[in-house]
């Protein structure tokens, strides 16, 4: 029998809403981020996990630092980032909300302990 799961963002706590865990996803990572106005997210890359990521911006505006470049992001913008690129989100005056989806390029996803 086919199965589905539903999560409500307003019932998930924190700046990082752990959708993968809430929905029981096992093949890829997926989280919802809600950065308050002017906040900076974690600067990181995905070299250790070899994880390619896609960010779908759904509300607010801001910038995504990718290596030495900055990309203006906001509602309706979608960005893909290679694993080795260092990235850091920065929320604008309205805050910034996005969905992050990721999976390793070799296809062997291992859920992180934090998410």
Q: What feature does the model see in each segment?
A:
Residues 32-35, 47-64:
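Short, conserved beta-strand element in jelly-roll/cupin
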Residues 1-29, 36-37, 110-115:
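A short, N-terminal "cap"/entry segment at the start of jelly-roll beta-barrel domains
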Residues 10, 88-115:
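Double-stranded beta-helix
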Residues 68-84:
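Short acidic-glycine-tyrosine-enriched beta hairpin
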Residues 39, 54, 61-63, 70, ...:
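Structural motif
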Residues 20-22, 42-48, 90-91, 111:
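Short histidine-centered beta-strand/loop micro-motifs
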Residues 43, 64-65, 81, 87-93:
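Short beta-strand His + acidic residue motifs that chelate non-heme Fe in jelly-roll/DSBH
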